[in-house]
Amino acid sequence: MNNMSLKFPDIAINSSESSDDEDPSSKNEKKDGSIKVVKGLTDEKKVFEKAKNDFDEALAIIDDDDFEYTKSEDDKVRRKIDFFILPIMCITYGMQYLDKTAVSYAAVYGMKQEAHLSGYVYSWLSTIFYLGYMIAQYPAGYLLQKFPISYFMFIAAFLWSACVLLMAACSNRHGLLTLRFFSGVFEGCVNPAFVALTAMWYKREEQPVRVVSWYAFNGVAIMVGALLGYGTGHIKGSLQNWKYPFLVIGAISTAWSFVYLFFPQNPVLARFLNAREKRIAVERVRKNRTGMETKKFKPSQALEAFKDPQVILIVLYNGLCQVTNAMSVFSALIIQGIGYSGINATLLTLPSGAFAVAGMIASGIFTHYFKKGRIPLAMTTSSLTIVGSIMIWKIPHSNPWPRVVGVWLFCTISSGNAVILSLLSSNISGYSKKVTVNATMFLFYSIGNIVSPQLFKAGQTPEYIEGIQASLVSVCLFEGVLALLAFYYIFENARRDKLLENNPALGGEIKNEEFLDKTDREQIKFRYVW
C-alpha cells in the first residue's frame, strides 16, 4: 500500500495530534457545554466570492468572529432538521421502492399472461429498469452538483411517477419495457441525492441512524405494497386487475413529488431555520470534515475516487449485494410457487417488510450506542440472509411455512446495506469526489441488479432455486469484501496516527479547513469510521 500516498497541506501552524477516537475540532467543546468555533479565513470577501466555486457554500455564512452555541441549541437544530428533512426523505425512499416493485403485484394478477410476457421478458422488466438506472448515474451526479437539489428531486420524482402511471395504459411488452427503462433513469437519481443530503445535514455520528431510517422505508413500502396489492386485487372495475397497482401507486407518487418544490437546497438556504440556527447547522457538520456543498466540479477529485482502495471495495460490495435484489420482484412469485394463491402470496410478502424494518431498527439502535462496528454489524445481519437462502433451498416442499419464513429472513439483507451506505456520507470528503463515488457506487448497484433477475430464469419456476443459490454465493463473497474493507480502515487510521506522531507539524491548524473542499486523502486529520 506504499503507492497509495496521501496529499497533505504544506501549511502547518499550531501543531496538534489526532487519534482514531477524537477529531481535533472536538477540542472546541467547553466545560460549560457551549461549543466554540475557531475564527474563519481572514480575507472574507475573497472567500465569499470563491465559496460559490472552489470552496464550500457553508463559507457564505461563516464570518471572521468567534461563534459559540450551546448543546441545547445544537439539539434544537437537530430536532428541526429531523422534523422538516428526514420525513420527506423517508417517504420518498419508500415511494420509489413501491413504484419499482409494482410489477411484482401486477404479475400475480395476470400481467404476464395478458401482456404476453414470457418468463424471460418478465425478468427483463427488472433488468431494463436497472439499465436505465445505470445510465443515469454519472449525469445525475453532475446535475446534482450543478442545480438546486429541490428542483432536481421534484423533476425526478414527478417523471418516475408518471412512468408508473402510464404502465397501466400498456397492453404489450414493448410499452412496459420502455416505461420501465425510463422509470429506472429517473429513480436512479434518488440514492446519490440522499447520500449527499445526509452528509450535508447531519453529524457523522448521527448519519447511520438517519440512513437506516430512510432506508427502512423500503421495508415499510413492502408492507404497504402488500396491502395495496391485496386491496387492488379485489377491485371489480372495467380495467384488467393487473393495471390497478400501477394506477394507485403511480397516483400517490405523483402527488407526493410536489413536496420537493418546498424542499431547502442546503442549510444556508433553509427557511425553517433562522439566521443563528443556519450558522449552527453549518457548524454542526464541521467536525465531519466532509464539507457541505460545492458547485464547481473538480476533475482531480473524481480521479482520486477511482484510485481510492475504500471506493473500490465499497462498489464491489454493492455490486455483489444487489445480485440478491431480484427477490423484491420475484418474492410474490416464489411464495406462490411454494403453494399459495396469487392474492394470498401478495399478502404473505408483508412480513418481508416487517423483517426488513426490524433489522433496520436493530441496526439503528446499535449504531446509536456503538460508534464503531458498522461493518461487523452489516456482516452479522447479512448472515441472516444466508440462513434464509438455505431454508428456501433445503427445507422439503412438504413443509411450506418454514420456506416462507426463509423468504422473510432473506429480506433482512437491506439493513446491512443501509449501514454500509452510511459509510459513503461519513468517509468520503470533497464534494466532486463524493458525487463521483456515489455515481460509481450506484452504477455497480445497477450492474448487480441487471445481473440479478437473469439468474431467476423461466425454467426455474415455480420456486427459482438456482436464483436463490446464486444469491447465496453472492452474499458469501461480499462478506469477504467487507472484512477487507474493515481491515483497510483500521490500517489507514493507524498509519495516519503514526504519521502525526512522527511529524507533529503535519497536524497544524488551517482555518476552516473543514470547508475548503478537501478530500479525505488530503486531510491527515481525517479518520475513517468502520
Swiss-Prot record:
It comes from the Eukaryota. GO terms for molecular function: transmembrane transporter activity. GO terms for biological process: transmembrane transport. SUPFAM superfamilies: MFS general substrate transporter. The keyword Transport applies. Signal peptide: none annotated. InterPro entries: MFS (IPR011701), MFS_dom (IPR020846), MFS_trans_sf (IPR036259). The chain crosses the membrane at residues 83-103, 124-144, 147-167, 181-201, 211-231, 244-264, 323-343, 346-366, 375-395, 404-424, 436-456, 471-491. PROSITE patterns: MFS. Residues 24-33 have a biased composition (Basic and acidic residues). It is a multi-pass membrane protein. The keyword rRNA processing does not apply. PANTHER family: MAJOR FACILITATOR SUPERFAMILY (MFS) PROFILE DOMAIN-CONTAINING PROTEIN, PERMEASE-RELATED. This is Uncharacterized transporter C460.05. It comes from Schizosaccharomyces pombe (strain 972 / ATCC 24843).
